[in-house]
From Swiss-Prot:
Superkingdom of origin: Eukaryota
Protein name, per record: Photosystem I assembly protein Ycf3
Species of origin: Arabidopsis thaliana (Mouse-ear cress)
Transmembrane segments: none
Protein localization: Plastid, Chloroplast thylakoid membrane
Main location, first listed in the record: plastid
Function text: Essential for the assembly of the photosystem I (PSI) complex. May act as a chaperone-like factor to guide the assembly of the PSI subunits.
């Protein structure tokens, strides 16, 4: 039985019911339906903190999913898991791969900026101001892209860009 069918969370159950109805109504191939089932189960496992199970489901969804737009969200969620696990290099890779398929994911740009900013802070603590500046410059570029896609969002990033005189 798919994981999402046994989940006790009301929102997850509601999402599952709506998704199942849509899958029946919208013409899709069996592969697309199976890919979505793995994606949905991955989201369910991820929301419960079961990252290993979520990754297994996402990798299986990636194997089956052919639509670049849908693949971008799978890759983005894999990036989220790696971010949560402190695997920032892997996370950046998956966010980048998601953006290659869908350049309109401001949340991926934001998460990449947060990682770069964090690495800049680490470089400062290690006394490497040159490396810190490089990381901060990269964070600024990613935040600018996120803000361009969704003006009015990422207020803290906008404030940081303004305070550090990186906002044009």
């Amino acid at each position: 039985m798919p994981r999402s069918r046994i989940n006790g969370n009301f929102i997850d159950k509601t999402f599952t019911i709506v998704a199942d109805i849509l899958l029946r109504v919208i013409p899709t191939t069996s592969g697309e339906k199976e890919a979505f089932t793995y994606y949905r189960d991955g989201m369910s496992a991820q929301s419960e903190g079961n990252y290993a199970e979520a990754l297994q489901n996402y990798y299986e969804a990636m194997r089956l999913e052919i639509d670049p737009y849908d693949r971008s969200y799978i890759l983005y969620n894999i990036g989220l898991i790696h971010t949560s696990n402190g695997e920032h290099t892997k996370a950046l890779e998956y966010y980048f791969r998601a953006l290659e398929r869908n350049p309109f994911l401001p949340q991926a740009f934001n998460n990449m900026a947060v990682i770069c900013h964090y690495r800049g802070e680490q470089a400062i603590q290690q006394g490497d101001s040159e490396m810190a500046e490089a990381w901060f410059a990269q964070a600024a570029e990613y935040w600018k892209q996120a803000i361009t896609l969704t003006p009015g969002n990422y207020i803290e990033a906008q404030n940081w860009l303004t305070i550090t005189r990186r906002f044009e």
